[in-house]
Amino acid sequence: MNNNTTAPTYTLRGLQLIGWRDMQHALDYLFADGQLKQGTLVAINAEKMLTIEDNAEVRELINAAEFKYADGISIVRSVRKKYPQAQVSRVAGADLWEELMARAGKEGTPVFLVGGKPEVLAQTEAKLRNQWNVNIVGSQDGYFKPEQRQALFERIHASGAQIVTVAMGSPKQEIFMRDCRLVHPDALYMGVGGTYDVFTGHVKRAPKIWQTLGLEWLYRLLSQPSRIKRQLRLLRYLRWHYTGNL
């Protein structure tokens, strides 16, 4: 077994995170020895850390997820501050999803897509098939009624999907994945937020240079000034970081 099929864990404010060195490490870990892992992937950023602190239900949901990873640069910096020897890098959820889809297409892994607007979901399916020949065994947009959830879980189970990606925003997508796993446990679940919108070009992502510099949050703020309240809320996380309350 090579070093890429295992990964250390680090604890921030009671939350255990997987420490991936880079994207290749993440992929090799998830596909260790050619066998796709089963469980739930959850991207962790500063905003989600605050939600975990303030919402007991969300904290329980995310603690139960097997694969929590550093999606935000602030999380990476906090891990490195608390664990100076840590070799951990940011793995952006949107990038990880694309890499998973490319790998799934190559290996014929069955995929079920959940969430998003109907037109965005349709475009996502078409692009995945055209770009990577992804074996999409089913899909459902995010506009279904609560009473339709159980039937959807059964559809996912009947499809035999080995990867289920859910774009519903947090904590709705974590609740959905938790409940769906009771019916269809043998799969890798991934909460992907607005990834389908980015993938299909409906939402513009920060240029690579902004991402590399860890300034994607600033690009979003400049693009969407209405996010200012959300960004100001993150000052609380900065206080934890700079006072070492991690």
UniProtKB/Swiss-Prot annotation:
Gene Ontology MF terms in the entry: lipopolysaccharide N-acetylmannosaminouronosyltransferase activity
Pathway entry: Bacterial outer membrane biogenesis; enterobacterial common antigen biosynthesis
Annotated catalysed reactions: UDP-N-acetyl-alpha-D-mannosaminouronate + N-acetyl-alpha-D-glucosaminyl-di-trans,octa-cis-undecaprenyl diphosphate = beta-D-ManNAcA-(1->4)-alpha-D-GlcNAc-di-trans,octa-cis-undecaprenyl diphosphate + UDP + H(+)
Biological-process GO terms, alphabetical: enterobacterial common antigen biosynthetic process
CDD domains (alphabetical): Glyco_transf_WecG_TagA
The enzyme's E.C. designation: 2.4.1.180
A family per Pfam: Glyco_tran_WecG
Keywords, alphabetical: Glycosyltransferase, Transferase
Family that this chain belongs to: Belongs to the glycosyltransferase 26 family.
Function text: Catalyzes the synthesis of Und-PP-GlcNAc-ManNAcA (Lipid II), the second lipid-linked intermediate involved in enterobacterial common antigen (ECA) synthesis.
Protein's name according to its UniProt entry: UDP-N-acetyl-D-mannosaminuronic acid transferase
Organism this protein belongs to: Shigella flexneri
Gene: wecG
